[in-house]
């Protein structure tokens, strides 16, 4: 049914709870009660957004960005690092390195790549994002979600489009009109 939400409270006992001793830290960090609303918002957002064909990395970035943007609207008083499931330090790293992350994606021609491993490297949860560089261990996981969020925010700032129209737009149209350009 569409009117019932089941929440496994055993997923939110706190990052240091003994039940999670065998879990990796990148998973444990979000197993706390303030993440319940974020997880519900993420699940609900997925129902509002046309699921991409997921043929290109850009389509996945935009899809993830749309989900995070809905959190901006639904829980505006929540800190960004909580919305994306980062620590404060991880979000600071992403913000400080946004230009270089984007440069890496562009220079390595990842945006139109259909390589499935890009999801593992940059979208899916992990201890860090996998650029295959020395700085990998410094980066937060799922950095592609952050970049997608920034693209959507840039699109919304630079275009007068309704929320519903934006959610239904294809990734390429959003990207073309977003005017996304991280500062160095």
Regions found by a protein language model. Give the residues of each.
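Acidic/His-rich structured neighborhood in mature extracellular/periplasmic domains
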Residues: 1-91, 168-171
């Amino acid at each position: 049914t569409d009117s019932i939400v089941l929440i496994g409270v055993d997923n939110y006992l706190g990052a240091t709870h003994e039940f999670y001793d065998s879990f990796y830290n990148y998973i444990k960090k979000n197993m706390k009660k303030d993440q319940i609303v974020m997880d519900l918002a993420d699940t609900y957002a997925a129902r509002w957004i046309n699921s991409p064909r997921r043929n290109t990395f850009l389509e996945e970035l935009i899809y993830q960005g749309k989900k995070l943007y809905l959190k901006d609207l639904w829980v505006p008083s929540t800190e960004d690092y909580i919305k994306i499931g980062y620590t404060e330090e991880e979000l600071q790293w992403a913000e400080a390195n946004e230009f270089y992350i984007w440069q890496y994606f562009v220079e390595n021609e990842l945006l139109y790549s259909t390589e499935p491993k890009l999801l593992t490297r940059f979208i899916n949860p992990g201890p860090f994002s996998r650029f295959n560089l020395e700085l990998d261990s410094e980066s937060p996981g799922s950095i592609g979600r952050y970049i997608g969020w920034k693209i959507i925010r840039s699109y919304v700032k630079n275009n007068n489009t309704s929320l519903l129209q934006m959610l239904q737009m294809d990734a390429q149209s959003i990207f073309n009109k977003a005017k996304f350009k991280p500062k160095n």
